[in-house]
């Protein structure tokens, strides 16, 4: 294991990250305020004329230590921060600025990683849709898939210990420990998703920072194992993992960890060029071409390593290995599965001809119609059966605002589900939104749907066209075949970075 020592050592320059003095800089809090992650405008409630100075921050830190303002309960997350006194005010103010400060070394390493790998359009790799072309290319050659929930730490202190190998500033980490470890009382007696929800609502930026560092530490195990058994380098890994090293756990160096957990007799199990990993929304996918026995080896080795040496909670019994041809994945809003694509090929050799049936596997991405209708029913666009209804809360708005809201939602859904291999479900969603829009307008003008449609005609339906549909209708006004081919084809957009709520206007 001596050849791994240079790989496992901490970077020298990381030892010179002194971030604590930045806590007392006014522009840090102005920067955190401009990001707008917390819309409650916390600085307005302090009475210091929207400015943060050295004296103000010292007072806030002193009050945090002297008074019990860090206890977070379920009632605090629903408290109106505009009314009265908010006991989490001080911690929220400083945690926002502190999160911006700790992000500085991460941003610098990301920029240096992009420059080293000569990645020009890294924003394309951050798109949600960029995952699907990868799956289309790799999944037809794989046999088994496992949907794994990313393990969570057994205590918030683990998040601080993970972050201390990224940020070499004890003073800053002591303050981070104050925000994290003392902010949750009786951690072991509470349910983790509930704590995650409360903590993310009260300190969203700080929570994302801690969670991303935890995920990066969790994924560094996979990158470490892969890099040891393949001579070629992975350029893309430098973008997502700026740190790839391990450290001592319970006085045992990492060399002994791998020597004990992965003896030489079983290391060949990891020499699998067809093992692929994808992460999404707190879950991850492990897919392989191997037999189930080897995948089970992967599962138990990784789970044991995560539990014993990364202090995270994960159970092998909750990880299921499924045959890819018989299993569908609920993946980023799509139902993805493998289906055979049959084709007939005729081969001519001299005077003889042969007809051969070729069956090729193809990734099938479907629109989840039932969950989408449930979401539309939840925000009162239709009932539980999918029948459109009027949006009564929007009836007081102008006609332009009503149409604009419906059109925006319809176009966003069409944009996101443009990669669907079957568009009939998407057409039904568009129909619900169009008719709901008409019913809302008819309700506002105290008219019937039929009368209102006669008055507007086809102008209203044209508003619901996407940009691509509108351009094609102008180029080919009489040719419907081109539009049909466009609807059938799958298009993945590289400008989608998050999945917004259907309705975010209210």
Curated annotation (Swiss-Prot):
Localization: Plastid, Chloroplast
GO cellular component, one term: chloroplast
Coiled-coil region(s): none
A single BP term in Gene Ontology: mRNA processing
Subcellular location, principal: plastid
HAMAP family from the UniProt entry: MatK (MF_01390)
Function in brief: Usually encoded in the trnK tRNA gene intron. Probably assists in splicing its own and other chloroplast group II introns.
Family listed: Belongs to the intron maturase 2 family. MatK subfamily.
Protein name, as recorded: Maturase K
